[in-house]
Curated annotation (Swiss-Prot):
One of its GO terms (biological process) is regulation of stem cell division. The keyword Endoplasmic reticulum does not apply. One of its GO terms (cellular component) is chromatin. This is Nucleosome assembly protein 1-like 2. PANTHER family: TESTIS-SPECIFIC Y-ENCODED PROTEIN. Coiled coil: none annotated. Its main location: nucleus. The gene is NAP1L2.
């Protein structure tokens, strides 16, 4: 009995010493925790053998301890194999455990750290590329300025385009090179009519010169145009009225933001520009809304600045996503008294409890308006409001402002509608396929029920 008790005490003390040794080594180095854990589990029975060698007094007791620890190591190895069988689920779309990397072997963890270092270097190169790309954008923005300035002058009736500048071929008038060569070969002289049918058909008499006839009609209408010329000059508006208001209202994401009381102010827009940050400054772009002098606010320029993420965070460089917007800031609008469309003023009458005197108190409450877009309070990427604001700023910079005439004329809307129609057709097609599959499944179920009924009849 005494000998068995001594053997039990020796085995317990050896296991305790081995566990303490593992804990000390684990606190020493973070990356060697996997080795210590593996040694603690005793995959090869090494912990038991080291503990038995440390005792060195009773070989048989040491062998028993080593054997016991070896069995524990086998059990631990079995549990590791079971957990490894479950790990691939995380790679198929399931949420990975936070200690997934910690559970990997030490050599594998070293390789993962090497890959992370490579990823950091790649992100540094990407950030450098984006900064240089921003410089190229700035260079071409200067080349665009003459075109954008002429657009502003035409919209605001500062410049009247010539007839040559107004010549624009629509899609129906476009022709390819083969058709142009065909016209050059067969001639296209004024007053000359081409005969595209055989002479024996007798249809030549029906062809006449439309150009000559139009000239005759124009001569007959010269008197009418001369009499109404003065009235037309008075009726013709200057420039393109409500250009920017129409553009903004034709944008799906902006339409819900524009209220009736915003439209009179947006009619005063003379131009919307995109200004990129100067060299050496943090990457950003500013949307500039230029207004005519008006009765609503004293500002003639309202701005919204979007700061881009162009550098890696020292504490965590891996979530880098390119030129994502970090935050945005608006400007302070100097509203004239009683003209602030972003606030709703309510007057209340209050009666004094003791004296009975009545006083009028006014309270301001925020209300929906397009001009909340210029809120001076910074908006970060946290939250849904930030994502919506960043998407709107990106669309204004990239699509709406450079292609404003397409949104004014509705050409951009047609492309948007085509995309919507395509999505609807795809949804309808998917619904038809789904219905067909469900009908086939119901038929299979009915056949199964019939087979079950036949089997029951046979059994009877």
């Amino acid at each position: 009995m005494a000998e068995s008790e001594n053997r039990k005490e020796l085995s317990e003390s050896s296991q305790e010493e081995a566990g303490n040794q593992i804990m000390v080594e684990g606190l020493g180095e973070h990356l060697e925790r996997g080795e210590d854990a593996a040694a603690g589990l005793g995959d090869d029975g090494k912990c038991g053998e080291e503990a038995a060698a440390g005792l060195g007094e009773e070989g048989e007791n040491g062998e028993d301890t080593a054997a016991g620890s070896g069995e524990d190591g086998k059990k631990g190895g079995d549990t590791d194999e079971d957990s490894e069988a479950d790990r691939p689920k995380g790679l198929i779309g399931y949420v990975l455990d936070t200690d997934f990397v910690e559970s990997l072997p030490v050599k594998v963890k070293y390789r993962v750290l090497a890959l992370k270092k490579l990823q950091t270097r790649a992100a540094n190169l990407e950030s450098k590329f984006l900064r240089e790309f921003h410089d190229i954008e700035r260079k071409f923005a200067e080349m665009y300025q003459p075109l954008l300035e002429k657009r502003r002058q035409i919209i605001n009736a500062i410049y009247e385009p010539t007839e040559e500048e107004c010549e624009y071929k629509s899609d129906s008038e476009d022709c390819d090179d083969e058709e142009m060569c065909h016209e050059e070969m067969y001639g296209n002289e004024e007053g000359m009519v081409h005969e595209y049918v055989d002479e024996d058909d007798g249809y030549e008499d029906y062809y006449y010169d439309y150009a000559v006839e139009e000239e005759e009609e124009e001569e007959e209408e010269d008197d009418i145009e001369a009499t109404g010329e003065e009235n037309k000059e008075e009726e013709d508006p200057k420039g393109i009225p409500d250009f920017w208001l129409t553009v903004l209202k034709n944008v799906d994401t902006l339409t819900p933001l524009i209220k009736k009381y915003d439209e009179p102010i947006l009619k005063l827009l003379t131009d919307i520009k995109v200004k990129l940050s100067d060299p050496g400054e943090p990457l950003s772009f500013t949307l500039e809304f230029h207004f005519k002098p008006n009765e609503y606010f004293k500002n003639e320029l309202l701005t919204k600045t979007y700061v881009l993420k162009s550098k890696l965070a020292y504490y965590d460089p891996h979530p880098y996503r390119g030129t994502a917007i970090e935050y945005s800031t608006g400007c302070e609008i100097d509203w004239n008294e009683g003209k602030n469309v972003t606030l709703k003023t309510i007057k209340k009458k209050q009666k004094h409890r003791i004296w009975g005197t009545i006083r009028t108190v006014t309270e301001d409450f925020p209300k929906d308006s397009f001009f909340n877009f210029f809120s001076p309070h910074g908006i970060t990427s946290n939250g849904r409001d930030g994502n919506d604001d960043f998407l709107l700023g990106h669309n204004l910079r990239t699509y709406i402002i450079p292609r404003s005439v397409l949104f004014f004329s509705g050409d951009a809307l047609e492309s948007q509608q085509e995309g919507v129609v395509r999505e609807v057709n795809d949804a309808i097609y998917d619904k038809i396929i789904y219905d067909n599959w469900m009908a086939a499944i119901e038929e299979v179920k009915a056949c199964c029920k019939n087979l079950e009924a036949l089997v029951e009849d046979i059994d009877r």
